[in-house]
Amino acid sequence: MQQQGTFCDFPGGDSWVILSPIEQSIKRKIETVGTPLKDWDINIYRGVLTGYNEAFIISTEKRDEILSNCKTEDERKRTEELIRPILRGRDIKRYGYEWAKLWLINTHNGVKGRIPRIRIEDYPAVKAHLDKYWDKIKDRADQGDTPYNLRNCAYLEDFLKPKIIYREIGFEMDACIIPEGISTINSILLRVMILKIF
C-alpha cells in the first residue's frame, strides 16, 4: 500500500536529490538563474584546529587572568592581540550567532614568507597558562613547530576578514556573517567561506 510517493529521476553522474514535484520545480528555477557554488570565486575553509581545545580555548575570566599576569603594558597589548574571540559550531544560529564569550589563544605557526611564527617567549603570561597543559599539548598531532604553536594554517589571514560561516552538520542550514577579527573552530560542524565581496 502506497500512502505517499514521488517520482525521482537519477540521471548519470548527478547527485541524488529527493524532492517533491513542487520542490523539484523550484530547484530547476533557481538553477536556471543562479550560479552553482563550484563556479563562485570563493574559498571554503574549515575553522582552526588546536589539537587540545582545553588549553587553547579559554573563558573570558581566564583571558582576564592571563592579561592581569602580564608584567608590562607592552606584553599586555601583544597578548590582547594574540587572544581572539572564537565561535564554535553550536554558537551558530540561523542568520546570527551567540558568542559564548570564549577566546582562542592564537599562537599560530605563521605563514611561510608572510607572517612569522608566534614565539611563546614573547608572551610569558600565555606560556605560564599553556605550561599547565604541557603533558597534553606536547604530544598532540595538531601542533606547529613547537608544542605551544597551533598547526600550520595557510589561510590564517582570512580569519581576520569578515566572513560567512555555516555549520556543516545540523538539522537546519544555520549561517551568518561574522565580522572581522573573530576566529572559528573546526569542531567538524563548521566551515568558513571567505567571500571576495567584502
Language model regions located:
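Polybasic, glycine- and aromatic-enriched phosphate-binding surface used to engage nucleic acids
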Residues: 3-198
